[in-house]
Amino acid sequence: MTILTQSTTWQALSAHSQDIPHMRELFAADPARFTKMSLSSCGLFLDYSKNRATPETLNLLFALAQEAKLDAKIKAMFAGDIINTTEKRAVLHTALRNTAEQCIIAEGQDIVPEVQQTLNKMQQFVTSVTSGQWKGYTGKAITDIVSIGIGGSFLGPKIVSQALRPYWITGLNCHFVANVDGTSISEKLKLLDPETTLFIMSSKSFGTQETLTNTLTAKAWFLAKGGSQSDVAKHFAAVTSNVVKATGFGIDANNIFPMWDWVGGRYSLWSAIGLPIALLIGMDNFRALLKGAHQMDTHFANAPLTENMPVIMGLLSLWYGNFFNAQSHVVLTYDHYLRGLPAYFQQLDMESNGKSVTLNGTHVDYSTGPVIWGGEGTNGQHAYHQLLHQGTALIPADFIMPLQSHNPIGEHHDQLASNCFGQTQALMQGRTLDEALAELSKSALSNEEKLLIAKHKVMSGNKPSNTLLMDKLTPETLGALIALYEHRTFVQGAIWDINSFDQWGVELGKTLGNDVLTRIGADQEATVLDASSNGLINLYRRGKI
């Protein structure tokens, strides 16, 4: 057993999990449950009353957090301590939205001035492009941005840009390319005019396989359409640490933005990786996004554990994963603009907490990161919600909805809200056999048929959910929401004693992929790998099955 599972608090939680009453009983016993189990901060409202939790549950979870020294670990992150121990790096994405501009030390120096310089450089770049001052090689202004990245440098900018569609004020179009499948970039290029297109390549090394391949394809297209090598600087910019490679490619050094080792890819949208966002919504709105995230940082760093939104959400998710065998967690966004958030939170959580050893290398004897998935309400209600209501797996859910719509048409938003709240109620209370029989009482069915159908209509309920609300989706509230999930992820990793900031599984995939690529291009059939890999490579080389 690990230290965590040996703790008396862990053992108490395990025993306590067997004694939790049904949520119907909890609500019936305490009419003030909603008031007691909800809180507001940073423009967000969290209702966590529809959880299998009592005051004793929460007290035990908070005690577990204290035993794990969560307070100290939070302080260590914000202070710039080396908490990514396997890569010997600080974790300071919070510094990117540090609007207070207090001194933050990383690698022996105050990083705040460079962060602010980069924001100012972004401001100049955005102004130049959006004002029409930046000209392409034929003298035309830029109309289209193509953001080329992978992982965090792709998903963050894409999802945030999509979410903030009502704030697109610059008149530009933006296209996102990540997958190395040639179809992805080919379909984008078909829509574009090389004279008015600006590519932004995001890769720390300027060598990430997918990103470099797509960028080289974009450059070849640009040159084939009439541009010259000397024109590349007018149509390509980069976010990278490798200035030498970027300038060698043809990018002007003035249009190269930095990346830092103390910012992981999945936490990087707040940096110059967010240039596509800023080019669409303008720098004032981009700074508002940072402001909202900073507000959540401040709340996370300073609020007591018992009133701390990321802490409460993280602990409740851990509660279900470790004591109820919940293997997945669903995120349901009742706002069309937020439809991409489940995929973003999927990467954030699963890449961070998909680990199986503790910081000292001990194999864990408890579940860590769950599968994160989800989608857009009300679409999901006609698909996978059936499994949430009557399936055999326990799947905790987060419902996210703005109270006000950017498009208040007729009763659309009223219906959306009623569906959202109705789903949380249905998951919580379910439907008993007696209730199902009562619904069938006036039907022409026989009593035997009524009983059979009623059994199929029974729903156990007691399915946990959180509801997150905001007045309206704005850059500020979106920033706070994303930072909330970042810190929720941190909380779980801190208690599980794992490193939430490396990704060795991703690195292994890259290494083996490069090895396979070499064998695909070899002159002879593959024979030295396992039989399956050899067979697949050789089938691919033949081009037919």
Curated annotation (Swiss-Prot):
Documented EC number(s): 5.3.1.9
Gene3D superfamilies named among the record's database cross-references: 1.10.1390.10, Glucose-6-phosphate isomerase like protein, domain 1
Main location class: cytoplasm
Pathway as given in its UniProt record: Carbohydrate biosynthesis; gluconeogenesis; Carbohydrate degradation; glycolysis; D-glyceraldehyde 3-phosphate and glycerone phosphate from D-glucose: step 2/4
Molecular-function annotations in GO: carbohydrate derivative binding; glucose-6-phosphate isomerase activity; monosaccharide binding
Free-text function comment from the UniProt entry: Catalyzes the reversible isomerization of glucose-6-phosphate to fructose-6-phosphate.
HAMAP family recorded: G6P_isomerase
UniProt xrefs under PANTHER family: GLUCOSE-6-PHOSPHATE ISOMERASE
Name by which UniProt lists this protein: Glucose-6-phosphate isomerase
Lineage of producing organism: Bacteria, Pseudomonadati, Pseudomonadota, Gammaproteobacteria, Alteromonadales
Gene encoding the protein: pgi
